[in-house]
Amino acid sequence: MPEPPNVDVVIEIPRGSFLKRGSTGHIDFISPLPCPFNYGSVPSHIGMEGDLLDAVVLGPRLALGTRINIKAWDAVTLTDRGMSDDKLICSEQAPTLSQRRDVLRFFHFYAKCKGLLNIWRRRPGRNACEGWCGADRALARARPRDDAWHGPPVEF
């Protein structure tokens, strides 16, 4: 098996946090459930939806703003309001089968919740978890961030 790529990730939502922050740092919403993973973004890449490429970091809680260089083992693709949105799955060691199941289960649930939130916010479009796509594929579909990027083109 080839060595997974390493990426720099900045933590936006520490594991256990109820505050959902966007890549620009603003609070998007307060969740009724804590985030089960450290969630952040790869500041060097823009995802297909026009925002920083998302990343989940498995393991112990990391503080808000932590910057970590870590292996991207896989990726999950979500569709949010009809836009593809890859999430790199990162950890020091290869995720266990149990962790992989938990990640996929979370994103299936998250897609349903985000769909309801988008209905309430009157933001149309399909919401779903499409499943695994691979870290290399997610990185290939992303584009390098340049100085012209100042935030996502749409509100999330």
Language-model-detected regions and their locations in the chain:
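Hydrophobic N-terminal alpha-helices or hydrophobic patches in metabolic proteins across all domains
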Residues: M1-F156
